[in-house]
Amino acid sequence: MSNVPAELKYSKEHEWLRKEADGTYTVGITEHAQELLGDMVFVDLPEVGATVSAGDDCAVAESVKAASDIYAPVSGEIVAVNDALSDSPELVNSEPYAGGWIFKIKASDESELESLLDATAYEALLEDE
C-alpha cells in the first residue's frame, strides 16, 4: 500500500495538500499517483500569479506511460511553482511529499478544504480502486 501521510489532505484525483506556516498550501501528487504514472519525464507547471478554481486542471505530469492533468484542490492564486522539476521531474517519483511538490496556492475559500479527504478516507478510496 502507498504511503499516505496523516497530516495531509487529499483529493479524489490523487493530489495532496499541506498547509504551510505562511498560510499558503503546497500541492503535489500522491505516491499512489506517481506509482501509476511511472517515471516522470516532464512536469508542465502552472503560471505564478494565475488564479484557479477548485477542480481546474492547472499542471500536467508527463511520464513514460502517460500525461496526466493535475487539478487545483482548492480555489486561489498560484504563488510559487517547484522550478526544480524543470531539470529533475523524477523528484515527483522519489520524493512525492517533499522535493517533488508541484505548486503553492493561496486559497481564496478555505471552506473548500472541507470537501477534501483526510488520510483515512484517502486510504479507503485507494482500497476501492
Curated annotation (Swiss-Prot):
InterPro entries named among the record's database cross-references: 2-oxoA_DH_lipoyl-BS (IPR003016), Biotin_lipoyl (IPR000089), GCV_H (IPR002930), GCV_H/Fam206 (IPR033753), GCV_H_sub (IPR017453), Single_hybrid_motif (IPR011053)
SUBUNIT field: The glycine cleavage system is composed of four proteins: P, T, L and H.
Cofactor(s) needed for function: (R)-lipoate
GO biological process, one term: one-carbon metabolic process
Protein name per the record: Glycine cleavage system H protein
CDD domains in the record: GCS_H (cd06848)
Domain of life: Bacteria
